[in-house]
Curated annotation (Swiss-Prot):
Residues 37-43, 99-114, 166-182 are extracellular. Signal peptide: none annotated. It comes from Danio rerio (Zebrafish). The lineage of its organism: Eukaryota, Metazoa, Chordata, Craniata, Vertebrata. It is a multi-pass membrane protein. GO terms for molecular function: zinc ion binding. The gene is tmem163a. Keywords: Cell membrane, Cytoplasmic vesicle, Endosome, Lysosome, Membrane, Synapse, Transmembrane, Transmembrane helix, Transport, Zinc. This is Transmembrane protein 163a.
Length: 216
């Protein structure tokens, strides 16, 4: 069901607000994640930090998508946003996979402490809250770009909690040191698969809409 003009503009503004909040929050989480990754040698923390950086970029793309009030229903703008997101997903997944494989190959052991736990819990909760808000707005505005941004936040939430799980397992079972790197690889593969699917779905649609919709 298509929204009335005033409803569409109201939800467009909410999408902009959520995107701005997401940019600020995930930027802070990215810095915290990279700090934990380098200080505690955690591949899953690096994966989370990279995903948080990706979340910042995807929220910026959503900002661009809804920055023009007249283009709130623009299919062409929507599809371009999704193609850009797909490319970013694939590039970031390669970095996450590279770091995780390197850590497994060199048998880099993660260091576990309270700082790691606190960062992972806060990160996981914040990302899940952002994901729910983006999914809700994405469904109302029927926006694949917003839903994709929400998916990215949800992955960030899962990764935040995965840091906690792998660290706790390593604390009690040091012989399962490879869990951290394995989770990093799995997350990298999920992000890569979603990025490829976005490109396969959206590139043909960008070409189709280019001819009959004026680019805003």
């Amino acid at each position: 069901m298509r929204l009335k003009p005033h409803e569409a503009q109201s939800y467009r503004k909410k999408a902009l607000w959520v995107s701005w909040i997401s940019i600020v929050v995930t930027l802070i989480l990215a810095v915290a994640g990279f700090t934990v990754s380098f200080m505690r040698h955690s591949a899953s923390a690096f994966g989370f930090a990279f995903d948080a950086t990706l979340d910042v970029l995807s929220s910026i793309i959503v900002l661009w998508r809804y920055s023009n009030a007249a283009a709130v229903h623009s299919a062409h703008r929507e599809y371009i946003a999704c193609v850009i997101l797909g490319v970013i997903f694939i590039l970031s997944s390669l970095c996450i996979l590279g770091k995780a494989i390197h850590d497994l190959a060199t048998k880099l052991l993660p260091e576990v402490d309270d700082f790691l736990f606190s960062v992972s819990i806060v990160s996981g909760l914040m990302c899940v809250i952002l994901a729910v808000a983006k999914f809700m707005l994405g469904r109302i505005l029927t926006s694949r770009a917003l839903i994709t941004d929400g998916f990215n936040s949800m992955v960030g939430g899962i990764m935040g909690f995965s840091i906690l799980i792998s660290a706790e397992v390593f604390r009690h079972y040091p012989n399962v040191w490879y869990l951290d790197g394995t989770i990093g690889i799995l997350i990298g593969l999920v992000i890569q698969a979603y990025g490829v699917k976005l490109l396969v779905d959206m590139i043909p649609r960008v070409r189709q809409t280019r001819n009959y919709e004026r680019f805003e």
